[in-house]
């Protein structure tokens, strides 16, 4: 069995080196402009998270789960949160370190695989911010269970995830269904996995809504709100016809 999470770590390092849009940190000017009524962060590509989902950040212990890249954590730090970022990409974490040193705020930076037990005590955080990233893990139930464990009672989980539509198709033109869902390359012919990694896509999975939303509920969370979203311009063609992403707010 391949160590697919290490492949994905290396893939994100390469994307970051090549200037992936999710690896470009906020500028000093953008950081300076952040205020309680003036900030925007993304769980999914286009729609910024409603401010009321955060419930106030000053003094709150916040975990950015698979949230490296220097885009969200600087905002949370500027708003007074006590921040920890956890990611499996060295390059994404290097960017977090660079921005924190440039702006002079403290942050705990931890490299790790979210398919393993998170290196935190039970009930360590008030809020977890988890943007689209569980497409890179096979077992999302484990991720939701770990989120529940490390959140304090009454804590908030803000999560973004793919709804699976992106995995139905291999090419944009024409839009022809070629894959069964849920998409799991580890259970498919070896050639499909080799094609995915050779194309520089890493090893990606789709997950059902039973896994994504049902998994949060099964872990013990109470779902409070959600919204749908699409790719930005130039993204997958299917986004012109239907939303591909969901963001959820859940409470422990």
Language-model segments: what does each one mean?
Residues 141-156:
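A short glycine-rich, Lys/Arg-flanked "PGG" loop and its adjoining helix->strand segment in the class I
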Residues 156-190:
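Conserved class I S-adenosyl-L-methionine
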């Amino acid at each position: 069995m391949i160590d697919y999470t290490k492949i994905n770590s290396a893939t994100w390092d390469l994307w970051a080196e090549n200037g992936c849009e999710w690896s470009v940190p906020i500028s000093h000017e953008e950081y300076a402009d952040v205020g309680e009524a003036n900030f925007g962060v993304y769980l999914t590509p286009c729609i910024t998270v409603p401010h009321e989902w955060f419930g106030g950040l000053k003094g709150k212990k916040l975990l950015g789960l698979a949230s490296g890249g220097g885009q969200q954590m600087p905002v949370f730090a500027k708003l007074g949160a006590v921040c920890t970022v956890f990611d499996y990409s060295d390059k994404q974490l290097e960017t977090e370190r660079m921005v924190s040193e440039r702006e002079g705020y403290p942050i705990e930076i931890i490299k790790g695989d979210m398919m393993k037990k998170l290196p935190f005590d039970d009930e360590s955080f008030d809020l977890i911010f988890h943007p689209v990233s569980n497409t890179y893990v096979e077992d999302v139930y484990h991720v939701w269970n770990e989120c529940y464990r490390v959140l304090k009672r009454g804590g908030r989980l803000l999560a973004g995830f793919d709804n699976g539509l992106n995995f139905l198709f291999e090419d944009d033109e024409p839009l022809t269904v070629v894959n069964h869902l849920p998409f799991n390359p580890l259970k498919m012919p070896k050639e499909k996995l080799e094609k995915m990694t050779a194309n520089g896509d890493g090893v990606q999975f789709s997950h059902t809504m039973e896994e994504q939303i049902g998994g949060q509920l099964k872990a013990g969370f109470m779902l409070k709100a959600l919204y749908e979203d699409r790719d930005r311009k130039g993204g997958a063609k299917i986004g012109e016809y239907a939303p591909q992403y969901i963001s959820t707010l859940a409470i422990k």
